[in-house]
Amino acid sequence: MTDFIPTTDLSDAQPQAQVAAPVLRDFGGRTRFQGAAVTLRISENNPLVRQTLQTPGAGRVLVVDGGGSLNCALLGGNLGVFGVENGWEGVIIHGCVRDTAELRELDLGIRALAAHPRRSGKLEEGERDVPVTFAGVTIRPGDHVVADEDGWLVLGAESP
């Protein structure tokens, strides 16, 4: 992993940085994380999240557009463990998580809208490696995502 540069410094130095609206909460045990984005677009079903977190993360960040659903959780403790075991830096979800006490203990950055006790559906549907837009930013596969105590932002893959 490269040296961490705080989001405040990046937003000052990189005017092209897309700064996300402060709508997501921090649920993971790691507050600061960064990496290349892997994107998913799903709707209240999380098998693609599971499948992705079971692959080598190689220091990347999984960005999940769950459509902003507040009806169920797209990530819980078991999937969070897969993320840690497979080297993911973090997960950003435009949707909900559950098992928040477990997630807080993991060495994984996790941002989501809220906590919800209901599990997601198990249909294998959705899209991977597509541009996703939420919180006022568009994230493309390979874009650099940086998150810390002050928020999160997106730099294009070509940015330093």
Swiss-Prot record:
It holds the Pfam family RraA-like. InterPro entries: RraA, RraA/RraA-like, RraA/RraA-like_sf. It comes from Deinococcus radiodurans (strain ATCC 13939 / DSM 20539 / JCM 16871 / CCUG 27074 / LMG 4051 / NBRC 15346 / NCIMB 9279 / VKM B-1422 / R1). Homotrimer. Its cofactor is a divalent metal cation. Catalyzes the aldol cleavage of 4-hydroxy-4-methyl-2-oxoglutarate (HMG) into 2 molecules of pyruvate. Also contains a secondary oxaloacetate (OAA) decarboxylase activity due to the common pyruvate enolate transition state formed following C-C bond cleavage in the retro-aldol and decarboxylation reactions. Divalent metal cation. Substrate binds at G76, G77, N78, L79, R98. GO terms for biological process: regulation of RNA metabolic process. This is Putative 4-hydroxy-4-methyl-2-oxoglutarate aldolase. CDD domains: RraA_family. It catalyses: 4-hydroxy-4-methyl-2-oxoglutarate = 2 pyruvate; oxaloacetate + H(+) = pyruvate + CO2. Its EC number is 4.1.3.17, 4.1.1.112. The lineage of its organism: Bacteria, Thermotogati, Deinococcota, Deinococci, Deinococcales. The keyword Chloroplast does not apply. A divalent metal cation binds at D99. It comes from the Bacteria. Belongs to the class II aldolase/RraA-like family. One of its GO terms (molecular function) is metal ion binding. Keywords: Lyase, Metal-binding.
